[in-house]
């Protein structure tokens, strides 16, 4: 059974999470930054989940980790992400690569193969297949994962991107994304027609309210001027029908 906690106020309300999480809850899944682009209090949600013996799974934007708290430091047990932003163009929707990491106690439950760092006989850094299930080779139909060539190539592309950027480069990119998003929000809200829907801190995306309450007409005008304005949120949230 899956229970959804609404976050139409901008971020996930901790009190609402506490009401639905109990000793029978297997895991809590949260996205950070969330669908609205706002930054969640992951540490607080982690405390609520762990107090009931549940795991915390977090879906993240890899670029945001250049400036946001590391998921592990916030108490996250399993982290997943879409890796497209790590050096891969949009490519009309794919192929991309998925990212998954976990605490060491769960490593043997991860699908696929686990590569580990070691040294060779000349004390040079190298990588080896540390863990892999027999099914990967002898019973492919029962294997937990089969990574195809496309995903392998894009994983290599992401590895090259990360090695070139380095920690400081990732921080710079994350800061640039945030600065440009906040600049865009500042410029839009100088117009009487627009205002920010939420006061929460945001990373890339942000929600704008159309004070004239004519989102569809606004989107049509933007399209005619070759502008991809955003998603009309009323299709998911009735209370945000004037937002995008």
Positions of the model-derived regions?
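Conserved PLP-enzyme active-site core in the AAT-like
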Residues: 1-128, 193, 208, 212, ...
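Glycine- and acidic
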Residues: 2-5, 26-31, 140, 162-172, ...
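Active-site C-terminal subdomain of aminotransferase-like
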Residues: 86-192, 196-199
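Conserved C-terminal alpha-helix-loop-beta "cap" of PLP-dependent enzymes
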Residues: 168-244
């Amino acid at each position: 059974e899956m229970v959804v906690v609404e976050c139409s106020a901008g971020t996930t309300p901790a009190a609402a999470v506490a009401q639905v999480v109990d000793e029978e809850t297997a895991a809590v899944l949260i996205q950070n930054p969330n669908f609205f682009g706002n930054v969640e209090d992951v540490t607080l949600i982690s405390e609520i989940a762990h107090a009931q013996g549940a795991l915390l799974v977090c879906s993240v934007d890899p670029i945001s980790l250049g400036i946001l708290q590391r998921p592990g430091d916030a108490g996250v047990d399993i982290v997943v992400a879409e890796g497209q932003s790590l050096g891969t163009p949009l490519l009309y929707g794919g192929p991309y690569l998925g990212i998954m990491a976990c605490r060491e106690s769960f490593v043997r439950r991860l699908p696929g193969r686990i590569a580990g760092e070691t040294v060779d006989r000349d004390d040079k850094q190298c990588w080896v297949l540390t863990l892999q299930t027999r099914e990967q080779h002898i019973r492919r139909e029962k294997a937990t994962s089969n990574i195809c060539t496309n995903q392998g190539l894009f994983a290599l592309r992401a590895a090259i991107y990360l090695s070139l950027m380095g920690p400081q480069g990732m921080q710079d990119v994350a800061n640039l994304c945030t600065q440009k998003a906040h600049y865009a929000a500042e410029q839009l809200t100088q117009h009487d027609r627009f205002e920010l829907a939420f006061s929460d801190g945001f990373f890339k995306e942000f929600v704008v309210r159309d004070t004239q309450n004519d989102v569809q007409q606004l989107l049509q005008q933007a399209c005619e001027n070759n502008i991809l304005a955003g998603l009309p949120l009323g299709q998911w949230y009735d209370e945000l029908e004037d937002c995008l």
